[in-house]
């Protein structure tokens, strides 16, 4: 009986520890339906961080699974004025500690520089940093797909 109680207690602790908040914040004045394009900014500005390089690949994939069409930095100048009005610049950040990993992806209007949406994915079992990171990436990807659903 003690063993079952101990096992149940451990599973409950793991469950509670993994319950971190993933959420999306959308600007009150933003109409996300107006946006069709996205471009990652500051590409290759990682200062040697392998985690950020890995995150960029996975964030790019997540955005491609939404309705937003990815546009490279060099291709922005080829967009028409109307297309630039539908363009979001994408910035992201990764924070990790022993308890959890957090991945935040911010979407900023190209012309105004105003943040219109921020998606946050967090995950933490505290057992394996890479596992927590992958969990946070999956959660932020889910938030992006919900925020910019395919039509």
Per-segment meaning from a language model:
Residues 1-19:
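Sec-dependent bacterial lipoprotein signal peptides
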Residues 20-33, 65, 116-151:
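C-terminal/domain-edge helix-coil "capping" segments
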Residues 93-126:
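Amphipathic beta-strand/beta-sheet edge segments enriched in Tyr/Trp
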Residues 48-56, 98-101, 126-137:
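Solvent-exposed, acidic/flexible segments
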Residues 53, 57-95, 99:
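Short, solvent-exposed, polar/charged sequence segments at loop or secondary-structure edges
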Residues 17-68, 150-151:
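A structural "domain/chain start" motif
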């Amino acid at each position: 009986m003690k063993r079952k109680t101990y096992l149940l207690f451990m599973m409950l602790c793991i469950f509670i520890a993994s319950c971190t908040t993933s959420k999306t914040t959308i600007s009150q004045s933003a109409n996300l339906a107006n946006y069709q394009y996205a471009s990652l900014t500051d590409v290759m500005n990682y200062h040697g961080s392998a985690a950020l390089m890995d995150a960029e690949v996975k964030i790019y994939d997540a955005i491609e699974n939404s309705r937003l069409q990815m546009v490279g930095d060099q291709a922005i100048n080829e967009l028409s004025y109307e297309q630039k009005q539908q363009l979001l610049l994408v910035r992201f950040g990764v924070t990790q500690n022993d308890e959890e990993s957090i991945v935040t992806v911010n979407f900023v209007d190209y012309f105004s520089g105003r943040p219109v949406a921020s998606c946050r994915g967090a995950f933490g079992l505290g057992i394996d940093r890479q596992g927590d990171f992958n969990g946070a990436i999956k959660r932020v990807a889910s938030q992006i797909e919900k925020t910019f659903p395919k039509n």
